Amino acid sequence: MSRNGRNDYDYDDDYDNDQMGGRLARDRERDSEGYLYTKTGERNRRSGPEARERNRENALNRSRNDGRFAPERGGRGYGDDDVKYTKSGRVNGRTTREARERNSRTARSEERDELGRFIGKRGSSRATRGTYTEGANDAAQLLLGGKQGVAENPETDERHSDAFRMEHRRLAEERERDEFGRFLPTEDGEDGRRGRRSNSRRRSSNARSTSSRSSGSRSSGSRSSGSRSSGSRSTGSKTSSRSSGSKTSRSSGSSRSRSGSSGSKSGRSRNSRSGTSGRSSNSRSGSRSGSSSRSSNSRSGSRSSSRSGSSRR
């Protein structure tokens, strides 16, 4: 499947930009008939001479304005009245000639700093863009779990100081780049692409069972107090399972209980003998149940047939 979600053919790479890392179609080799091939080795039907000629004729026949396709033919360029249109067909007010001339005059008249940024009034969007101002977007930040990645105070945070920005700019100018302007890998393995690292530190090697945990065990007919599981009585153990949507079948004295994290169903125990906490076999979702019981290789959602708690009295 191509990156555009099509199964039958891959798109030509004429439009690939530098960030996507694709090669331009004119730099790729074609076969004797002028076709390109997809990554899977199939012939790209859109790269043939007939398709390319047809596309060229269609492009020449489309009405244009200032070198761009006009909106009445599906383009987003300036129309005959020199404005752009929204997707719903209305005039975009910021693209009118008056608005563009006003923006141009404002941009030329406003003062800039040594980095080329606008020096706007304090509190304006131009002066504080990318920084955190007290009271701004508090609700949105709380929904995200706090002010993540945002400076608490731009006045004292060094990342917003001019010296820090100048140093970053100097380091960026000194780094080597390839033919497309991308940073070349450095000695420490940094490849210059934000969000991508050459090592795999994000993968945790110890797969912990985050699904269920037991909170103590009692040997006198207590209730299983899991996440909203009320009504499943187990003789000989107190299980507090936090597993999401798991089944604990026949745990401690053949009591069948279903416990889930939210809105779970828990059935009554059947044939529970008081005094004996028997073997629990095939307990799905490793919730630790019974006295001195252990579930090995337990994960939420996975089936692990583990024997737990073979204590007899």
UniProtKB/Swiss-Prot annotation:
Biased composition (Low complexity): 206-266, 272-313
Region (Disordered): 1-313
GO cellular component term, pick one: virion component
Predominant location category: virion
Compositional bias per record (Basic and acidic residues), positions renumbered to this chain: 24-33, 40-85, 95-116, 156-181
Regions of compositional bias (Basic residues) in chain numbering: 194-205
Assigned keywords, A-Z: Virion
Keyword Cytoplasm: no
Statement: the UniProt record of this protein carries the keyword Chaperone: no
Subcellular location: Virion
Protein name: Uncharacterized protein R705
Organism: Acanthamoeba polyphaga mimivirus (APMV)
Lineage of source species: Viruses, Varidnaviria, Bamfordvirae, Nucleocytoviricota, Megaviricetes
